Amino acid sequence: MPVVTIHYDKLVKILGREVSFEELAHNLIPMLGSDVERIDEREMVIETEFFPNRPDLYSVEGVARALKGFLGIETGIPEYNVRRSDVEARVEESVLDARPCLAVAVVRGVEFEDERDLEHLMEFQEHLHWVIGRDRKKAAIGIHDFEAVEPPLRYFLADPNDRSWAFEPLDHPGEEMTPAEVLRRHEKGRQYAHLVSDGAPILADEEGVISFPPVINSERTRVTQDTTDLLIDVTGTDWRSVLDALHVIVCNLAERGAEILTVEILGAYERTTPTMELDVWDVPVSEARKLLGIDLSGEQLEELLERARHGAIFVPEGERELREYPLPDVYHIEADWREIPPILYEEDVVRVFVGPRRTNILHEWDLIEDAGIMYNYDRFEPTVPDFYTPSRADREREFINVVRDTLARMKFVEVNSLTLISPEENYRKMRLEPDGRAVKLANPIQKEYTIVRTWILPSLMRFLADNKHRPYPQRVFELGEVIERDEDAETGAKDRWKLALAIAGPGVGFSEIKSVVEALLRELDVTGWEITERKHRSFINGRCAAVLADGRELGFFGEIHPEVLTEFDLEVPVVGGEFDVAALRTAAGW
């Protein structure tokens, strides 16, 4: 999890109130849901770890904003000064198949008092890269000195070897490089080359290249201590991640009094960024009482949510005329706000307006958690239940842990992938036809995740494809759930635990995966098993086998078919297999 460096003098200045270093380090900051890693009383520095669901707290400005609410210094949605700029950015069709999403903002009036402020900004940027951007894959942030930028901007896909798009990358002044040379010679280029495919995404102004996302910015637009105005660009492959990253960073910079200016995105699509939209939620007072275990009134819940830096208004059950309650006028920007939804609960509720910096509010319970934090967990009175139940480890989980430990001793690395997948990867790329067993999502958000996986091996193939830049051989496994349709089940589907394993690298073959499977069966004390030939379209014919015990198939393994390797753009042989955990457990006598 990200570790945030907080200098006491910086925090107190933004906070606007004297608070002792000891109180901050030992009481207040931990109350925000963080784990203090290091306290340096001589340098007056606190290093604290925040959960990945709160990127808005990854800088001293975000921590100060939260503490203002906790201490009652300032409550409600922060008031930011937002207006339109005359800056435009044009997106060309060429980039849509590579890195299609672009969001841009200008932030004026930023003050860097000393080198620490610059270091904080860079640290904040990298934390967002890791948590929201998934190490720049989904979103990458570029921060520029706006005075060095000559709008309008142009975002397009260039030939990596075209010298007309050569530029001086950061930390290499005087060394003009093409995008291809950056990928070969620059340390950041080598680190992120795997995110760049055939062409090079380029963000340019009238003077030339200002950024080669997601790799490196131009030295020309370097931010220094004298910089007062910033241009912030966020590019990526996922719109939500891109907008979340932009909103979090501009809102935190605005905590120092900076002004946010929007930018018009034109060309392949049109939108104004940042959008600064609010989300609207209704929190039933009864639900908050039940989850927190305290007797809260509607007015008290409203106050707690305001202290959590949300907009909140208590709406009693009999006052439904407030269902058209307007959005708070806290963002000074002309915008077409979406229609405010009616209140659906037939009980007392608190209507909550959530600012765009809070990327983690996915359910009303998230808001109730915020209320609990503001109430102060130290005030909760623990109670001892008047009953107890003896516990023991679940036998299935015990067996799964034995399998996990056994494979770890065999030098395999465990992978945890999503249970959602696309039919493309679950079937076609594995040379299979859809069989109607997959559970489909009614309202998928992304085309990559429209069904629940029916087996795990495709997920491992995707993992190997994403890690081609890592050294070989690669030995990975996953223990996880798969779900299949079952008309006889109460829910219409059944879930099962599966084990999948794969080895990738030059020279791997059937004998290597066979020896691994045999060793695993011996370690699990499976008896009476035999290996027989099996046909499976994902494997090379004649190089696939099944493991049987008492006439029941435990799983299968073999050499992955070359067509499957091609579909996943893999250039080395892969062997793998998949086993039913319940069948393995039965055969092992658990």
UniProtKB/Swiss-Prot annotation:
Protein's UniProt keywords contain Aminoacyl-tRNA synthetase: yes
Domain B5: 276-382
Chain residues that bind Mg(2+): 360, 366, 369-370
Source organism, top-level taxon: Archaea
Gene Ontology CC: one annotated term: phenylalanine-tRNA ligase complex
Subcellular location: Cytoplasm
Main localization, broad class: cytoplasm
Enzyme Commission number(s): 6.1.1.20
Presence of the UniProt keyword Lipoprotein in the record: no
GO biological process terms, semicolon-separated: phenylalanyl-tRNA aminoacylation
Record's catalysed reaction(s): tRNA(Phe) + L-phenylalanine + ATP = L-phenylalanyl-tRNA(Phe) + AMP + diphosphate + H(+)
Pfam families: tRNA_synthFbeta (PF17759)
GO molecular function ontology, one term from the record: magnesium ion binding
Family matches, as InterPro entries: aa-tRNA-synth_II/BPL/LPL, B3/B4_tRNA-bd, DNA-bd_dom_put_sf, Phe-tRNA-ligase_IIc_bsu, Phe-tRNA-synth_IIc_bsu_arc_euk, Phe-tRNA_synthase-like_B3/B4, Phe_tRNA_ligase_beta2_arc, PheRS_beta_core
Keywords linked to the UniProt accession: Aminoacyl-tRNA synthetase, ATP-binding, Cytoplasm, Ligase, Magnesium, Metal-binding, Nucleotide-binding, Protein biosynthesis
Cofactors that this protein relies on: Mg(2+)
Assembly information from the UniProt record: Tetramer of two alpha and two beta subunits.
Similarity comment: Belongs to the phenylalanyl-tRNA synthetase beta subunit family. Type 2 subfamily.
Name of the protein in its database record: Phenylalanine--tRNA ligase beta subunit
Source organism (scientific name): Methanopyrus kandleri (strain AV19 / DSM 6324 / JCM 9639 / NBRC 100938)
Gene symbol of the encoding locus: pheT
